[in-house]
Amino acid sequence: MPEGTTVTRLLPNICTDKMEETRDFYKELLGFVVGFEHKGWYIQMALPDKPELQLGIMRLDHEFTPRPFQHPAQGVIISVQVEDVEATYATVKARGFELAHDLCDEEFGMRRFMVADPNGLLVNMFSFP
């Protein structure tokens, strides 16, 4: 780590024009709950039993983000390690989520599948046996 830099938190924020759909997606998929909302442009979510696992949702056109960078998010894969990927896969399918990539085994030992959020960002659900 660079001298003088001590990372104390990492909080990814999804910039979107689909605030409610994105919030509902992560609530339904992962069980995240809203911990903080600010004036309709920012939602911070976390897992109730692991509040350090957080995700932010930010209105795409809000002044917080400099105008030249106000573009829909792309090229990001959100990877989420779960205890039992088979059980998670069954639950996700039963709830009607559309799969972007079916359950598979990778040569390096990961078992995974993917769904796409309302913004087209991929969520890679995985575990290691």
Mark where each language-model region is.
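Conserved active-site tyrosine of GNAT-family acetyltransferases
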Residues: T22-K27, V92, G120
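Vicinal oxygen chelate
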Residues: M1-L11, V33-E83, Y89-A116, S127-P129
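Conserved beta-strand-loop-alpha-helix junction that forms the acyl-donor binding cleft
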Residues: T16-K18
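Short glycine-/small-residue motifs
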Residues: L122-M125
